[in-house]
Regions:
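Non-transmembrane, aqueous-exposed alpha-helical and coiled segments at domain scale
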Residues: 1-149
């Protein structure tokens, strides 16, 4: 989201509520809904439950869409200019710790010890931390594709 906003508002402060966001996946697919919550917080875009505006202005509802026909995972569009950028996350280039999936399986089937549960949580959070802090500016991980002319 940060990279998309930087692209759409170069050198300027993004306009909260001035962005339409479209997700390729359904809101219940994988972690799409979770990601959409973060995107909504940052952009002001909401589906139908957000800020309804004041005096008919500043309505932020109906700016967040799912199951959209977009090329990448998420499309961000400036309402005022129509400029759009598609964003994809290529997360496979940032590996999990080798034990992560075995620990996940134990957590899911209920056989994990408290220590294994804590280790799984730590492994998962370490990868999230690496994605955001070490690879947040990596164009091979977070790919932006301008849309249109």
């Amino acid at each position: 989201t940060l990279k998309a906003l930087e692209h759409l508002y170069p050198g300027a402060l993004p306009q909260r509520g001035g962005i339409r966001v479209e997700f390729r996946e359904d809101q219940l697919s994988g972690v799409t809904g979770v990601i959409a919550n973060v995107v909504a917080l940052l952009t002001g875009a909401t589906h139908d439950t957000g800020f309804k505006g004041i005096g008919g202005r500043f309505d932020r509802r109906n700016l967040l869409y799912f199951s959209a026909d977009v090329a990448e995972e998420i499309r961000y569009t400036r309402i005022d200019t129509g400029q759009s950028v598609d964003v994809a996350a290529r997360l496979q280039s940032v590996p999990f710790a080798p034990q992560t999936f075995a620990l996940m399986q134990k957590c899911l089937d209920g056989s994990a010890t408290p220590q294994e549960t804590a280790e799984f949580r730590d492994c998962w959070q370490a990868r999230v931390r690496a994605l955001l802090l070490q690879h947040g500016d990596d164009p091979e991980v977070f790919v932006l594709r301008p849309v249109g002319p």
